[in-house]
Amino acid sequence: MNIKNYFNIKELVCKHVYNKFGEMAWTFFDPRLLETICVIREKLGKPITVNTWHSGGGLTQRGLRCNVCQLVAEKTRLEKVYVSAHLQGTALDFDVKGMTALEFVIGLRQIRYFFLIRYAWNKMSLGYT
């Protein structure tokens, strides 16, 4: 699976990160997160929305965030400790087109069962115990 088949880097990072690093921003993500979101997108067969700033929308901090982003900058200014998986490239907030949160959870469970069954089948086929 290739994440670039489903997402543009602008969708996954804040505008500050994109403006400074461009396509190099892909390297800031944990590969497991990219693989996970790619599998979810592929298995559900529906578009996923993270950030929309690049197309004039108001979603700006649902992917990789930086110290300049309002959410992080405000907490820093107030001397609040802020450690987030969004800063480390290991979390995304997103919507799935045409699905409610409950429908997504049900779909995610089906994906999980698919991979558990595939894992068990591979384990049995290879003779592992």
Q: At which residue positions do the language-model features occur?
A:
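Extended, low-complexity, intrinsically disordered C-terminal regulatory tails
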Residues: 34-78
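Alpha-helix initiation/capping motif
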Residues: 8, 30, 69, 75-76, ...
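Active-site acidic/histidine clusters and adjacent loop/turn architecture
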Residues: 1-49
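Catalytic cores and adjacent binding grooves of peptidoglycan-active enzymes
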Residues: 79-129
